[in-house]
UniProtKB/Swiss-Prot annotation:
Segments forming a coiled coil: none
Name used for this protein in its record: Lipoyl synthase
Associated pathway: Protein modification; protein lipoylation via endogenous pathway; protein N(6)-(lipoyl)lysine from octanoyl-[acyl-carrier-protein]: step 2/2
Cofactor note: Binds 2 [4Fe-4S] clusters per subunit. One cluster is coordinated with 3 cysteines and an exchangeable S-adenosyl-L-methionine.
E.C. designation(s): 2.8.1.8
Gene Ontology molecular function terms on file: 4 iron, 4 sulfur cluster binding; lipoate synthase activity; metal ion binding
Gene Ontology cellular component terms for the protein in this record: cytoplasm
SMART domains with a match to the protein in the record: Elp3 (SM00729)
Cofactors (names): [4Fe-4S] cluster
Binding-site residues, [4Fe-4S] cluster 2: 94, 98, 101
Keywords, in A-Z order: 4Fe-4S, Cytoplasm, Iron, Iron-sulfur, Metal-binding, S-adenosyl-L-methionine, Transferase
Gene: lipA
Amino acid sequence: MNRPERLQPGVKLRDADKVSRIPVKIVPSERETMLRKPDWLRVKLPASNQRILEIKQALRSNGLHSVCEEASCPNLAECFNHGTATFMILGAICTRRCPFCDVAHGRPLKPDAEEPVKLAQTIRDMKLKYVVITSVDRDDLRDGGAQHFADCIREIRKLNPEIKIEILVPDFRGRIDAALDILSTEPPDVFNHNLETAPMHYRKARPGANYQWSLDLLKRFKERHPNVPTKSGLMMGLGETNEEIAQVLRDLREHKVEMLTLGQYLQPSKFHLPVERYVSPAEFDELKVLADELGFTHAACGPLVRSSYHADLQAQGKEVK
């Protein structure tokens, strides 16, 4: 029996190569079977792309990554023009193979020890007031990357003392308490971890993750830092029902999560999970009403909402759709 070829560090696997070994196999979508994208998902492009080019240049010159680009976010133009970006630390190669996500899989390189300082300097140069810091999954690291998050928060605050920092973290599988011990040295202003979908769809959409682990991570952070808001995000269109999503919202509130983002899943390529339905704006509005009734302090629900979409406005309590 031939052994699978060992991945070389730094090599990005995408599309069919990325999802070749997940438990629920992906059958590449044929154009004629793909659902037609409705009009409410049309993204209006800005009149000028100057600000977009400036932000991309700032990222390139410092060897930094944005999840906006790596995950092919549909809101990239709007957010970059708004002067916001979600920085992705610890490289652009993930140790997981989630088939909804467009971030590459592979064996990551060692963390860049200079990245926290580069990130802080870039944020200062961009004159940002609110930043979101996220990362790929780093199951290869003993702490899951928690120390690197803490280092980034510390360096950012050194150069940007008035800034607000939201972190969007992986699940720190098998090392939650150790990771939270480290993050307690430099707690963020908002702690975000995405559940992504309802638990019965985890095997298909989040191989290697566990619904209860993710809930426990959010709850345990809140127990340690009761004054720091906790936040989570979900996608719709992966085969879930509205009632399944409603139950996830109840579970989040039972685990003391206060902020919510709920948006439409969009298929990055034919090798990713197909969109099983497009959820109407009216349905998102109904789930927004439920979220408010359940006691979420902030709930952004709409087709183009993403976890860090206008995160600065949401943190200020402003309406985001």
